[in-house]
Amino acid sequence: NSGLVYRDMSGGINEAFSDIAGEAAEYFMRGNVDWIVGADIFKSSGGLRYFDQPSRDGRSIDHASQYYSGIDVHSSGVFNRAFYLLANKSGWNVRKGFEVFAVANQLYWTPNSTFDQGGCGVVKAAQDLNYNTADVVAAFNTVGVNASCGTTPPPVGKVLEKGKPITGLSGSRGGEDFYTFTVTNSGSVVVSISGGTGDADLYVKAGSKPTTSSWDCRPYRSGNAEQCSISAVVGTTYHVMLRGYSNYSGVTLRLD
């Protein structure tokens, strides 16, 4: 319905919608999905594209910050991953996720929609369907897309306070959760995760949100025992990301 032009950001949205529709069809037929595009046509394991971490295919991008002018339509990874994150949120599933993307395509996307405009369209569709719009904004925010329709900026993350651990954290494979803290005193600080089950990865970056390709500290160890020691600069805001290498639960995050 939208007539998305098959180049630039609109081309990425166009390609993503095809992938998303395919996953929705798989969900309709089988009752579950593998989050892999084209797995059935591969004799061995793997597929053409991956929803949880699009860059696994060697061409797609995971985050809008990796987009550049002239990139091919494998920038579809941005919207594919947003769809994956949304469909895996509590109260959502593949069908509900596809519904909001489909309505956005029918009513709100235009031939040259940018990522932000496309995300805004999905939020408007969720509002039309009486679905949780905050979940949609959060999913797009994780992949670097401002889906707030130019009104309220997306959340920058929950505040992490020194000596006040946050317990019982959980997340899905490929899911991302963000926190921030601002340094008020000189000296070193330690950000750490511990406990629980599964495997969460810790990322820290000064001044902006870390991604899987841009960070100041990333221990990247098996399990949930990770820490980043930082020679903190007074007045600097640090961004912390917890990313699920696999599903995890019961994890504690602390700043010391």
Swiss-Prot record:
GO terms for biological process: proteolysis. It is found in: Secreted. It is an enzyme of class 3 (hydrolase). Its cofactor is Zn(2+). The keyword Nuclease does not apply. GO terms for molecular function: metalloendopeptidase activity. Binds 1 zinc ion. The active site is at H74 (proton donor). Pfam families: Peptidase_M4_C, PPC. Gene3D superfamilies: 2.60.120.380, Neutral Protease Domain 2. The keyword Protease applies. InterPro entries: Peptidase_C_arc/bac, Peptidase_M4, Peptidase_M4/M1_CTD_sf, Peptidase_M4_C_domain, Zinc_Metalloprotease_M4. May play a role in ulcer formation. Proteolytic digestion of gastric mucus has been suggested as an important mechanism by which its pathogenicity is at least partly exerted. This is Zinc metalloprotease.
